[in-house]
Amino acid sequence: MLDVEQSTVVHHAGGARPRLIEAGRLLVFLVAGTMGFAAAGQETDDASRAYGELLAQALDGRGLVDYPRLVDRRGVVDAYVDRLAAPGLLHEQQPEAQRLATLINAYNAFTLRLIIDHYDAGRLSSITDLHGGKPWDVAEWTLSGQRVSLNQIEHEHIRENFNEPRIHWALVCAAWSCPPLRHELYTAEDLDRQLADQERRVLLKGDRRFIQLEGDDETAARVTPLFEWYGQDFGNWREYSNQRRPGPRLRFVGFLDYDWRLNAQPSP
């Protein structure tokens, strides 16, 4: 399961203590921990609401980002990133859907924060220009009290613990060929619907960033290289794709080139 911090009761050498004292101390410990989680949750609500509203304002219909708007309102992004740092945010007693939604949101928020940190008035052209071309390996983020990199979130926390291939339509690496960002945060209650919608946006909506049909009958297809990179997560990715598309079966003739240009909205 996820590598989260857990509080433990330490038994000291030197003889048994009166059970009443031990019970009292344990009760104080548990109450304090519960109050801490409640306080963190209350802070989360306000930060999440403001951040979700900003996403709705800063994204267009293709999921491309108005980065100047995010730069102007980076305080909202910072507050949400700070909220993600709270110890216990990924507590093991939470439902799996809650933890997965939090991990997806964290990956995407940290990526946006990385871009606005280096946006440089629009001169940044690609996330691959940062950290020697390997920004995903830098453990510069704090999630649930732990320092992590984007790659650790994706591979160690998500892929190793959740059998959910649709996460590849939800994790957004700030590139033109990445899946579209949503105009909202992922939530435990709506996660299945949200992931299904992301899958439709990638596989069914005719966006040539992800799938291009060729031939007179449009049954030959070039598809996103995400299938090439993460094919094992989908099982038989060819069958996976065809089962989710209406009409005649597609023949997959190759992978599209991945476009690492920034997923920014075109300048007006």
Residue ranges and their predicted role:
Residues 1-21:
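N-terminal secretory signal peptides that target proteins for export/translocation
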Residues 13-15, 32-35, 118:
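Alpha-helical transmembrane segments and their juxtamembrane interfaces
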Residues 23-35:
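Bacterial N-terminal signal peptides
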Residues 38-43:
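Boundary at the C-terminal end of the N-terminal hydrophobic targeting segment
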Residues 44-91, 97-102, 111-268:
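Interaction/scaffold regions that mediate signaling and macromolecular assembly across diverse proteins
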